[in-house]
Amino acid sequence: MTNSSSTSTSTTTGGSLLLLCEEEESWAGRRIPVSLLYSGLAIGGTLANGMVIYLVSSFRKLQTTSNAFIVNGCAADLSVCALWMPQEAVLGLLPAGSAEPPGDWDSGGGSYRLLRGGLLGLGLTVSLLSHCLVALNRYLLITRAPATYQVLYQRRHTAGMLALSWALALGLVLLLPPWAPKPGAEPPQVHYPALLAAGALLAQTALLLHCYLGIVRRVRVSVKRVSVLNFHLLHQLPGCAAAAAAFPAAPHAPGAGGAAHPAQPQPLPAALQPRRAQRRLSGLSVLLLCCVFLLATQPLVWVSLASGFSLPVPWGVQAASWLLCCALSALNPLLYTWRNEEFRRSVRSVLPGVGDAAAAAAAATAVPAMSQAQLGTRAAGQHW
């Protein structure tokens, strides 16, 4: 994941990574609002991602396989919000021509710019990979048998997936220096880092849409009630086996031939029967999640493609596309925790009164969760 604007047609080696500090004085008044937006995203994203990491590390009920991938993404987003965004906000407020640090720190030919680009690339790449891991985890949780899910997401396998996401991101970041434009050199006709960024975003979008739309189809045709963002499965997982044991089906009387007719499956009790509104709400939640991803990433895809083929892209379009993508780093915790009752309880226990409003707003639409004792297994929320 690389910044396409770093390889744009601008040859200003001292400019900001997001072209917030161009040499043109006409942009001076427009850099301030963008810097203020980065400042707000930095503060909000740092607090939100830090809170999720703290809650998961402090409460054992939150230490599940799915939350491990969420925490991995929050750690990557925290590096973007706490380390990279403040630098962009400060650089955007500096006068034109003084976007880089003073002194000889950057005498090595854009080393500070490469450092910021590498930090951004590492954080965003791990974050996007974590979104894919969360989507794949949820897709397999619904579409595969519990035993298969447990085998795939053993603790060792989960740790390997997390380590692989960082190793892959680090490998991609190490490819940045050879492709960095040389000071005073003519810009190439094809910018491969920008094309690589566009290809990575398109691949991630395809995987997310496949997983989440597959979940929507499964929820629509299934009798199980699923809260997709919370992932409380009340069918197919052993919780329904416990319900079936509590409501056994009586065998039919033997027929004339002496053979007993096979027992017909007993319907689930009314408390476990899904309601159409709840299934529709789960589907809308997934579609909303997909829309957020598309809105945050697709503008950057087109900007990266245009920059990759040396097509002129207005500065405002570049800044807006990167702001949307970076906003995903700040909103990442809310995407996965806003309807999770365990997270709300944890927030209320740490900050009394803070989560009451969110709990009241979600009370009418929340899907009741089954405890681990009711599930009888750790398939839906395998602990680390």
Swiss-Prot record:
> Which Gene Ontology cellular component terms are annotated?
ciliary membrane; cilium; cytoplasm; nucleus; plasma membrane
Q: Record keywords: Lyase included? A: no
Any Gene Ontology biological process:
neuromuscular process controlling balance
> What GO molecular-function term can you cite, just one?
G protein-coupled photoreceptor activity
Q: Which residues lie on this side of the membrane: Cytoplasmic?
A: 57-73, 137-158, 217-285, 332-384
List of glycosylated residues: 3
What is the membrane topology here? Multi-pass membrane protein
| Transmembrane spans | 36-56, 74-94, 117-136, 159-179, 196-216, 286-306, 311-331
- Identify the keywords attached in UniProt to this record, alphabetized: Cell membrane, Cell projection, Cytoplasm, G-protein coupled receptor, Glycoprotein, Membrane, Nucleus, Receptor, Transducer, Transmembrane, Transmembrane helix
Q: Ranges in the Extracellular compartment?
A: 1-35, 95-116, 180-195, 307-310
Q: Report, as the record phrases it, the tissue specificity of this protein.
A: Expressed predominantly in the striatum. Expressed also in olfactory tubercle, nucleus accumbens, amygdala, and neocortex. Spinal cord, pons, and medulla expression remains discrete. Also expressed in peripheral tissues, including adrenal cortex (16 dpc to 21 dpc) and cochlear ganglia (19 dpc to P3) and also at moderate levels in retina (18 dpc to 19 dpc) and spleen (21 dpc to P7).
Q: Where in or outside the cell?
A: Cell membrane; Cell projection, Cilium membrane; Cytoplasm; Nucleus
The record's listing under Gene3D superfamilies reads:
Rhodopsin 7-helix transmembrane proteins
Function (record text): Orphan G protein-coupled receptor implicated in a large repertoire of behavioral responses that engage motor activities, spatial learning, and emotional processing. May play a role in the regulation of cognitive and motor function. Couples with the heterotrimeric G protein complex of the G(i) subfamily, consisting of GNAI1, GNB1 and GNG2, thereby acting through a G(i)-mediated pathway. Plays a role in the attenuation of D1 dopamine receptor (D1R)-mediated cAMP response in ciliated cells. In non-ciliated cells, involved in the inhibition of the beta-2 adrenergic receptor (B2AR) response.
**Record-stated family:** Belongs to the G-protein coupled receptor 1 family.
Please identify the protein, giving its name as recorded. Answer: G protein-coupled receptor 88
Give the source species.
Rattus norvegicus (Rat)
